[in-house]
Amino acid sequence: MPIRHCIVHLIDKKPDGSPAVLHARDSELATSQAMENLLADLNESYNAKQGKAWGLFHEESGAYPFSGWLKAYLDGEQDFTAFSRQAVEHLQKLMEESNLSTGGHVLFAHYQQGMTDYLAIALLHHSEGVAVTDALDVTPAKHLDLGQLHLAARINISEWQNNKQSKQYISFIKGKNGKKVSDYFRDFIGCQEGVDGPGETRTLLKAFSDYVESEDLPEEQAREKTKTLVGYATGQAKMGEPITLEELSGLIDEERPKAFYEHIRNKDYGMAPEFPADKRTLSQFQRFTGRAEGLSISFEAHLLGSKIEYDEGRDMLIIRQLPTQLKDQLKRRQD
């Protein structure tokens, strides 16, 4: 991926209310193999993170100046170093106001992937390790720990500039379990949530379950299509790309590539044509299957606790809201 501009600054700050001290770099980093490796590893770690949110910029204001500075840089009114200096000074101020914040190296990278321009911003920390020297001595060594990436954002510059209706050109890591630690970083970017990734993913899985039921698919076909959906969505999440409903529909049924897409539109699930997949929600979407003499059962894991209840003590499976076709067959049997 071509790196257009990249720079790192350091904010020295402990989470004890002490002042944040900025050590700013005066010039951009030169492009190198090490820099390309760092950005590739950062993207890989970022894409793998669960609990990300997607959104858009707040209206530019004194509280949210970042988008204005970014626009000025992209319009050629200031260079990348000056833009990053303005931004990191603003981050330093917000860190001082947040007693929970911890400093670190702040990376700004403007790069291109395919035909799309991105800006990545991440707060990086070191971990202590060891290394073996040329003299075969063991010595302490520090390394950037991208496995502990907790504060980062990625802005799809091309989407922001070319699609004024978009509500998902920014992604950022949210604090776990409602923690407020990351709020100051979200405010630094000036981002508001625009797309509910977990909610959209849950709706997709509900629409797919309804589709499988309405098509009365054999168990093997249902299992294969479920595997296709989860594989596609997980792959998109790993690459940091959104789910595209039309593309997914074509993969689910190559002979009728519009069938699933038309099912979604006709039933009015209210889903966006594109949205980010939530990996945590996807991990819950697996099929339980079982066979015995004269019996075959298959259902999605997310139905446990709602439509399906497992009573281990009595060795029973309780099914609520039976499929219409099954009920019709049972009624005809009684008649």
Curated annotation (Swiss-Prot):
Q: Name one GO molecular function term.
A: single-stranded RNA binding
Where does the chain cross the membrane?
A: none
What Gene Ontology cellular-component terms does the record carry?
Answer: bacterial nucleoid; cytoplasm
Kindly list the places in or outside the cell where this protein is found, as annotated in its UniProt entry.
Cytoplasm, Nucleoid
Instruction: State where it is primarily located.
Output: cytoplasm
UniProt KW keywords: Cytoplasm
Identify the domain of life: Bacteria
- PANTHER family given in the database record: NUCLEOID-ASSOCIATED PROTEIN YEJK (PTHR38772:SF1), PTHR38772
HAMAP family in the record:
NdpA
Hey, which family's this protein in? Belongs to the YejK family.
Q: Which organism is it from?
A: Ectopseudomonas mendocina (strain ymp) (Pseudomonas mendocina)
Q: What is this protein called?
A: Nucleoid-associated protein Pmen_3549
